[in-house]
Amino acid sequence: MSLIIQSLPHWSRIPPRPPQLSQFQNSSRPKPLIQAGQVQHNALQIARRSANYHPSIWDPQYIESLKSPYGDECFGTRLEKLKFEAKRLLEATIEPLSWLELVDSIQRLGVAYHFEDEIKEGLDGVYGVGAHAGDDLYTAALQFRLLRQHGYGVTPDIFNKFLEKERTFKACTSLDAKGLLSLYEASHTMIHGEEVLEDAKEFSVKHLNYLMGNLQNNLREQVQHALEMPLHWRMPRLEAKHYIDVNGRSDERNMVLLELARLDFNFVQSKHQEELKEVSRWWRDLGLAKKLGFSRDRLVENYLWAVGIAPEPKFSNCRKGLTKLISILTVIDDIYDVYGSLDELELFTEAVKRWDIEALETLPEYMKICYLALFNFVHEVSYDTLKDYGWNILPFIREEWERLCMSYLVEAEWFGNGNKPALDEYLRNGWISVGGPVAMVHAYFLQGRPIRKDSINFLDHGSELIYWSSVATRLNDDLGTSKAEMKRGDVPKAVECYMIQTGESYEDAREHIQGLVRDCWKKMNEECLKCCLPKSYVETVLNMVRTAQCIYQHGDGIGTSTGVTQDRVISLICEPVPSQWP
């Protein structure tokens, strides 16, 4: 075990959740929803903190004006024809390397969900061949990465042919830029204990940087893009937009795939625009942003989160549900982090534990509308799941919200008492307070698949995949927000906890936390090879981390959502890709 991983919490099990859902199957309907307007308000004056969050940068009229022509039937007909042609191309490509490159392009272009069966059948055949991946580094690394990403138990022994007796990479590979880039991308699918892949990452980074100045423009851009963030860590929808642009400028572009990717991107974007309009109306009608002006009004940015986590068209309900969840969660987070007194926060936490509408009368005025919004949302999700699948998930997701609010209260008590927790103690609480577990449990039920008992049991007893992805999300969040929160005097987050604990500088502390993120990815990669959850859901969990790395890559992309976050919203949701290239 590395020194880095020892800084993470040491338990291997997640704290227990409520009884298995089978005990609640086909039970009575949730309580009817209550209208927020029924609540009577009583003002309570208390000195309040403020984070001075800027208001929403998105004009509701602009959101309502979004209208893409790509949802029209004529484009749907063309899309189906292109899918058929691409499927024929997959079937007709016999040469192994050409087929692997085709699959890699299909994935990067964001259209692999159309060809899941064909890709699986082909990879089954590749895996059956064993370690015979060809004699060049590029092919071997590409094959290894694709198999790992799809959950095949391939080992790094495939790289032995490129090693000297001393287990170092042969000198001749140091000049193969294309092979080094492929090796670099493959190394990020590593799990703990795979030293050859650790060496591969260091070796490829060193020599790619050395070769950079002598590379042709197209390859140099690819290397720079990869070294900024590896493919395995990138938000898929954002990578698809980038890769469509790169292919549009390439002399080697495949016109069938390129047109398919362009049209599919714009078609899916048209669906995303309609969803954004729907949840924007819901948010305005809910009234939380207007009533609770101290909180972050980030509906559009929250929808970007949802697009990053579950981008495919079939997950429309999941995206809308996650946007609602994140929006309500953000307000509650700001109540605990900034606005509420400790006495008020204890009342709110107790009300969530009771989960009784009568608890409303124990709350101060401003908390009532927030409690009702949460109450109604959870009952809506529970009712829809019971109606469609016969499972009463209310006790299950209630428990997740209770754990979340309890973790918020712990952080509020740390702040109120001036406590500065050690990094281990902070992360034991922080993996919950980041909202990962509550979001991923909701996502499972919102994705519209028949609910499997074995998956329920897996979630119920604690998912290591959800745990490590939540730790990684927390660490990425803290890397992006630490400067602003330290300046504001908030409770110490991961970077500051490590600085206080060790006396290290801010830069060294950030480097350590980045190392923890890398270790989390190794654990997630390992869990992906052995967990029993549906593959599409596993990707959803990984996408939470990928989206967090996108949102917090250049700072607090939610607290301050101008700049990079605004540009990414426009790029992914508002502006279609060009219909033709020079």
Curated annotation (Swiss-Prot):
Transit peptide, residue positions per record: 1-35
Entry annotated with the keyword NAD: no
Residues binding Mg(2+) 3: D477, T481, E485
One GO MF term attached to the UniProt entry: (E)-beta-ocimene synthase activity
One GO BP annotation of this record: green leaf volatile biosynthetic process
Residues engaged in binding Mg(2+) 2: D333, D337
Cellular component GO terms, alphabetical: chloroplast
Role, per record: Monoterpene synthase (TPS) involved in the biosynthesis of monoterpene natural products used by traditional Chinese medicine to treat headache, inflammation and intoxication. Catalyzes the conversion of (2E)-geranyl diphosphate (GPP) into (E)-beta-ocimene.
Record note on domains: The Asp-Asp-Xaa-Xaa-Asp/Glu (DDXXD/E) motif is important for the catalytic activity, presumably through binding to Mg(2+).
Similarity comment: Belongs to the terpene synthase family. Tpsb subfamily.
Name listed for the protein in its UniProt record: Trans-ocimene synthase, chloroplastic
Organism field: Litsea cubeba (Aromatic litsea)
Taxonomic placement: Eukaryota, Viridiplantae, Streptophyta, Embryophyta, Tracheophyta
